[in-house]
UniProtKB/Swiss-Prot annotation:
Entry similarity comment: Belongs to the PyrK family.
Biochemical pathway: Pyrimidine metabolism; UMP biosynthesis via de novo pathway; orotate from (S)-dihydroorotate (NAD(+) route): step 1/1
This protein's UniProt keywords: 2Fe-2S, Electron transport, FAD, Flavoprotein, Iron, Iron-sulfur, Metal-binding, Pyrimidine biosynthesis, Transport
UniProt protein name: Probable dihydroorotate dehydrogenase B (NAD(+)), electron transfer subunit
PANTHER family xref list: DIHYDROOROTATE DEHYDROGENASE B (NAD(+)), ELECTRON TRANSFER SUBUNIT, DIHYDROOROTATE DEHYDROGENASE B (NAD(+)), ELECTRON TRANSFER SUBUNIT-RELATED
Species assigned in the record: Methanopyrus kandleri (strain AV19 / DSM 6324 / JCM 9639 / NBRC 100938)
Amino acid sequence: MVSVKPIPAEVVENREECERTIVLRLRPERPIRWEPGQFLMLGISGVDEKPMAFSGGDDREFELTIEIVGPFTERCADLEPGDVVWVRGPYGKPFEVRGSRAVVVAGGTGVAPLVPLVERLRRARVHVTSVLGGPHADRLPRKDDLEKLSDELYVTTEDGSEGRKGFPTDVLEELVEKECPDVVYACGPEGMLVRVAEIAREHDVPCQVSVVRYVKCGEGICGSCALGKGLLVCRDGPVFWTEELEGTEFGGVRRDVTGKPE
């Protein structure tokens, strides 16, 4: 059930995950039933409200993986156990589990919705090969979790300080030939997702991506997350099969807080 009205949630834990990234664990006033790939709106009184992907836990206590990039997320980093925030949701469509072999591709904090997805896939006895990429060794969020949950984990860094030097898509090209996966899942920078979609299409592998766009209302009203062709990230996504995104603004036009093209 979606909570349209914000409800209070207590901060249970706020831990530093890696450089400029935290994991916030919250206990809402009442359980929120969510699925991997869905998101909520996180509000801090007197500050702002932002969309955040569910990143672990369960209905009664869940985690959010948050990159520190501005005033709101800096305030998130200052939260302490016992503090109260506001949440509403869940919103959006989740990932779909299919097949017996999957490749999961994460770029930076795009890993957030993929951690619970990998956990769900393993419970469904799906063989999971994960790829996690970041700029350098200190910016690989949830690496330990992915390593524990996945059958195999490949790491890439742009500077070569850990794992393979390069990008997650460099590894993906090899994996789709080696692993012959039934499906590819991905979340991260949109440029990366475009390349993931291209590789999956070239090898005729179904692919779901979680698209990150500016989301203001979460309820399909404001239009700030419009993708064209009548699609809204908050209502029709954030998870899409890549064929749904053909002919849209995905990989091209971006929109500002008002929904106007930038």
